[in-house]
């Protein structure tokens, strides 16, 4: 049958393996030239050794400091081979840094605990808190490091050193495999050319074999004296402030008049500079819903879901015209359903709800200088107003059913408040953009409701949340600031705004083609598709549209074969012993599907739909053609059910349930999952083209014979086609639902 097309693509894929397309060889070869960026890529700090002006080679030496490390344990064995400097960026508040020792205090075991103390605070040891000793607390008169420790006859002692540096720490010197020396010194200033890290030291044994060092905050490691580097890091480097005037913002948000737009160069050397940007922005949120109509008699709607929206707009910032691009997406949406079970009952299979604690993500990018070279960024801050949606005509939709007043789905009020700002990357039809993601949380809604007609008619359902919007746009304003590491020479840029890849271009072509493809797929006659599905389709049938493609048949075949190798269907078929039956994955892992002259399976329908539609579209691009073939194999008819027949018992499994029933009486029986899994690996698995509910409805309505029931259970193609030709509404509705899932 038609699915033999996929079998041929699998069995003859050797053709593309030995026939690589020349264009691939031209476009896939990459030569990488790069500059060693020093330890910035490791430590999120400036490069280790600065250059001295214009030079013609790398200005950076081997990294001396690594980090920040976030692991919670340092193994003892990693500290006994060489001197190790354990460094911390000065915390904002008092915090526990590390501890070596058992989980609870034991006077017979040596231990130590390191804290950072903020000036004006009292620090109390966690490890030693259970003992009665005044040394377990410390009143900090200045920023400091405090080492609480016990060893031998010393019940509890503490060592305190000043911590005035931006980055500082302690020195750990190994003695042998079971002992090490902790060294500390007051870090007050950088007046000297060198620094003695060992003004105070104490030798500690290991508490117990197997006890390591617990870390409670991120840290850096150095294997050689980092004093010179830390001294250079400490020097003030503010050099240039570029200030621009900004228009006054007349808005009801909490931001008031807003700050001046500032670009502040805070550090600079031969190749790199750190620039702090502060900008006011105008943010737009566009919420758009997508409505999918089901098959049948016109009363069935499959879903109403919120779409991920790409939206562009322009505004003026400090006299400069700014072109902005945002991507709006959603998280933690709720799902609702509505409707009855009869074919003429209006129903919505699923509609999304934005309710309290749902999230709206807005990824923002504009064409101003702040997003040029936006690769390494730190200290991202934002102060953004919220969004308010109130009822409008764009927040109602009327379902055009065949008979009666059109039911309406309505939304009321929605309030979004700003939650936080993150770095992100958004993908458009043409480019990938490094962006700022603004996270908004839903804090209140006035509810959704369904009416029998216009908004003033009777309500038939209601609930909390925001259910529908037809592209309504809301505005807010705010400020953003961040520090970006960029080249000192402004001519260097990263390919962000102008990037365009083959894959993105292909996605754009697919998007342009999607509506036409889906419209043709919806208009096809059921009997035509079933007749085509019952015919022995081959690769030559697929290439009937090749004359419209500006490539040779040989190149088209190679492209299709190569693309097909990436599909899940091909990868699973390549595993000869693959018999895994995964219930939670919509049964996609069933490979031993029944094959005989009369039995119809899902691949028969999907390949017939793909061949029919592509031939009618007359596609002129070989990449798009290959992409559609591969997508049809994996994505068409995602909602699949399978069954097996054992004597007079049918075992059936769907995406939502599993059950067994008698083939004559259709009475359900207990389902044995172990037995079913064993049968799935040994017996042919039948695609449930006509589902159990439809078979039962046909028997109850028309009183068909046991022989016809058996043929429907076995997905007998001639029997199904005869019901279609007789215009049986139940069978037509079922097949229409399957065909409606054959969409790009």
From Swiss-Prot:
SUPFAM superfamilies recorded: VP4 membrane interaction domain
Would the keyword Iron be found if you checked this record's keyword annotation?
no
Listed GO CC annotations? host cell endoplasmic reticulum-Golgi intermediate compartment; host cell plasma membrane; host cell rough endoplasmic reticulum; membrane; viral outer capsid
Where is coiled-coil annotated?
Answer: 503-523
Q: Region (Hydrophobic): which ranges?
A: 396-413
Q: Which GO terms describe its biological process?
A: permeabilization of host organelle membrane involved in viral entry into host cell; virion attachment to host cell
* Site (described: Cleavage): 231-232, 247-248
Quote the InterPro entries the UniProt record gives: Rota_A_VP4, Rota_VP4_MID, Rota_VP4_MID_sf, VP4_helical
Q: Which UniProt keywords apply?
A: Capsid protein, Coiled coil, Hemagglutinin, Host cell membrane, Host endoplasmic reticulum, Host membrane, Host-virus interaction, Membrane, Outer capsid protein, Viral attachment to host cell, Viral penetration into host cytoplasm, Viral penetration via permeabilization of host membrane, Virion, Virus entry into host cell
Homology family:
Belongs to the rotavirus VP4 family.
Q: What is this protein called?
A: Outer capsid protein VP4
- Native species of this protein? Rotavirus C (isolate RVC/Human/United Kingdom/Bristol/1989)
